[in-house]
């Protein structure tokens, strides 16, 4: 039985595989004979996470449960078809009431190869007193801001920019308060927060950073999947 003192997690996996050219949910696409979902859940557990709630497409819940049958203390619930933000809120509700200081992580199944050390760093930072923590990488490309017409309007200093990954970690009370404050945005993907740290920022919270990892790539397009398969084959 899980303890309230254990870190818990919401693993978002309700996305489609359309940009990968797949008819199945993206989280069920396989790497080395196992779905992305399984790899992501295994990585969370290895990093020190206890209970995990997975948000899945309503039509695929049984497939998801079957894919995770060899991982304990994990449950699958229906996610939202409106936004990731709303899916996370449903996952938090499924975790039930938690102590205010409980550490809760939010991770994307689309980042199946996140090293356990990244998860552990996030947990350690929250345990050390941070209310919200995100793993980040330096930006290597030059970035531009553009107008709706496509004209360049500015060049931000690259040294001030980072690329954000998951899992993101929070004190339970901080994340719940942030989701409650931003709940009205979740009904529309165009308005919804693209990550949970953004909701914390919106209520005036401080978000801290830890080092991410290049292996925590997000599988979105076919090239991402090809690279992830090479990395997974090397791990298997």
Language model region names:
Residues 69-103:
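Short phosphate-binding loop-to-helix
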Residues 1-7, 66-70, 186-189, 230-236:
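Short, low-complexity, intrinsically disordered N-terminal peptides in bacterial proteins
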Residues 11, 37, 91, 107-108, ...:
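Residue-level signal for inorganic ion chemistry
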Residues 113-208, 236:
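Conserved core of the sugar-phosphate nucleotidyltransferase
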Residues 10-14, 55, 106-107, 136-138, ...:
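Short beta-strand segments
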Residues 208-215:
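Catalytic beta-strand/loop signature of glycosyltransferases that borders the donor
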Residues 2-64:
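N-terminal glycine-rich phosphate-binding loop and ensuing alpha1 helix
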Residues 216-236:
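Hydrophobic helical membrane-anchoring modules
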């Amino acid at each position: 039985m899980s303890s309230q003192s254990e870190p818990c997690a919401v693993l978002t996996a309700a996305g489609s595989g359309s940009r990968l050219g797949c008819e199945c949910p993206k989280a069920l696409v396989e790497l080395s004979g196992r779905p992305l979902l399984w790899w992501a859940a295994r990585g969370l557990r290895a990093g020190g996470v206890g209970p995990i709630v997975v948000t899945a497409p309503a039509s695929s819940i049984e497939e998801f449960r079957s894919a995770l049958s060899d991982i304990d203390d994990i449950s699958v619930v229906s996610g939202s078809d409106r936004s990731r933000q709303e899916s996370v809120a449903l996952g938090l509700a499924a975790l039930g009431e938690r102590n205010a200081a409980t550490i809760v992580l939010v991770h994307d199944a689309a980042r199946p190869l996140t090293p356990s050390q990244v998860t552990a760093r996030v947990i350690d930072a929250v345990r050390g007193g941070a209310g919200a923590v995100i793993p980040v990488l330096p930006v290597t490309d030059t970035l531009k801001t553009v107008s709706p017409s496509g004209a360049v309007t500015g060049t931000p200093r690259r040294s001030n920019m980072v690329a954000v990954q998951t899992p993101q970690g929070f004190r339970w009370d901080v994340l719940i308060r942030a989701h409650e404050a931003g709940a009205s945005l979740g009904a529309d993907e165009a308005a919804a927060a693209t990550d949970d740290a953004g909701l914390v920022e919106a209520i005036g919270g401080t978000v801290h950073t830890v080092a991410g990892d290049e292996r925590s790539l997000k599988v979105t397009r076919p090239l991402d999947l090809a690279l992830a398969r090479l990395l997974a084959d090397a791990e298997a």
